[in-house]
């Protein structure tokens, strides 16, 4: 039986940063574009690119490094837009765990990772810092990295600042400890990448679906842009509408995660060319991409002007770190104004 319904698979259970997708649905923005969307949740986040690439699902969300690796492994997907730009990603741990800013302090520790590429990243870093993969114990945690740290199942684990780190900070607050005891060894700094773009969360499409339905994809992105604009213009009102639809997120932790995600939302939705070049090179360095791999992204389905890329990405990252720390302390919704 055929259907005009477009299937869209999230990268995880509904989270604060999924708000533009659900508001585009609940506020009727998809309907305005003549689209009938089915928003789906994965039981296993690692299945997302395979399900989309095999054509079982039309569209979805995935991080940049996974999107690149998917196509290299024979799952034809293409990024058509960005949702969350360069969230800080790294090895999270708690002060007092015996781990310090020295990467070698991870020797003998249990380190959690989401999926196989997380382990590949850690293994590559161990070589860079004079260690071997056998010097630590790898534990696959899925999306439960913060939970496993709190429960003592792992000593550290890969997570992102606006999600798992906030979860650790909330745990610390309940223990009467300072939130600053939640620490992160940022992978972009450890690996000398110059950006956290490998974990940029993207809107991706099955290539055959994209080829056959270019206008539907353009309309989808128009609806997403309208929802994103709405979120950025009035984040508090947008959140109230979101939790009315997703009451499970009506809690302090989710709200604080949303505040920390706010600065990372891509306002233009554009794929950033420089980021794709860097992460494609990183993927080749990790040997998950062949030497001749061509990046699988396009901006041709975005029907508004492309913004200029920041002139100094390293300075932008430095300023974002200061901005996010201020957001943690003050609990406000602010966007970072970058110098030209």
From Swiss-Prot:
It catalyses: N(6)-(pyridoxal phosphate)-L-lysyl-[4-amino-5-hydroxymethyl-2-methylpyrimidine phosphate synthase] + L-histidyl-[4-amino-5-hydroxymethyl-2-methylpyrimidine phosphate synthase] + 2 Fe(3+) + 4 H2O = L-lysyl-[4-amino-5-hydroxymethyl-2-methylpyrimidine phosphate synthase] + (2S)-2-amino-5-hydroxy-4-oxopentanoyl-[4-amino-5-hydroxymethyl-2-methylpyrimidine phosphate synthase] + 4-amino-2-methyl-5-(phosphooxymethyl)pyrimidine + 3-oxopropanoate + 2 Fe(2+) + 2 H(+). Pathway: Cofactor biosynthesis; thiamine diphosphate biosynthesis. One of its GO terms (biological process) is thiamine biosynthetic process. Gene3D superfamilies: Periplasmic binding protein-like II. Its cofactor is Fe cation. Pyridoxal 5'-phosphate binds at residues 115-118. SUPFAM superfamilies: Periplasmic binding protein-like II. A motif (CCCFC) lies at residues 195-199. InterPro entries: NMT1/THI5, SsuA/THI5. Belongs to the NMT1/THI5 family. This is 4-amino-5-hydroxymethyl-2-methylpyrimidine phosphate synthase THI12. The gene is THI12.
